[in-house]
Amino acid sequence: VLQAVFPDATVVVTHRDPVAVIQSAMTMLAYGQRLNRHRVDIKSLAEYWPDRIEHLLRRCVETRKLLPESSSMDSTFHEFMADDMAMVEKIYAKAGLELTKQARAEMQQFIDEHPRGKHGQVQYNLKEDFGIDPAVLRERFRFYFDAFPVKAEAK
């Protein structure tokens, strides 16, 4: 459908360690529940989110090959985090777009003014906070790590 509506679009498929995605999402949702519930339902979060992410990623692995190589690319989180401007350049090149000096300067200004960790970092612990062993979860998602060059982040 996307290609029918936007035939000249370039699709960038992003990839990240699903264990890191799950711990981040569950932590954010648990914090949100603390605002409007008497009790955070940790068990429900721990049961639902790994299943949901697995379903989504299995579909991603199955359907990624349907996107034409000429108008799609994969972007890993670790590549983006290592050098965000290099990833922007790759995306522009894949899309056949010119990355103007002005656009580059404005993006670099934003990056410089919003450094990662500026406001601290969330400390995650899947085992202690949610009773989930990251190694078990990582093995569950082996199919995804095998399909895409994703680096493990979560410990």
Predicted regions and their residues:
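ATP-dependent NMP and nucleoside kinases share a basic, alpha-helical "lid"
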Residues: 1-15
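Sensor-1/coupling segment of RecA-like P-loop NTPase cores
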Residues: 18-19
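PAPS-dependent sulfotransferases, especially Golgi type II membrane carbohydrate sulfotransferases
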Residues: 5, 22-74, 78-155
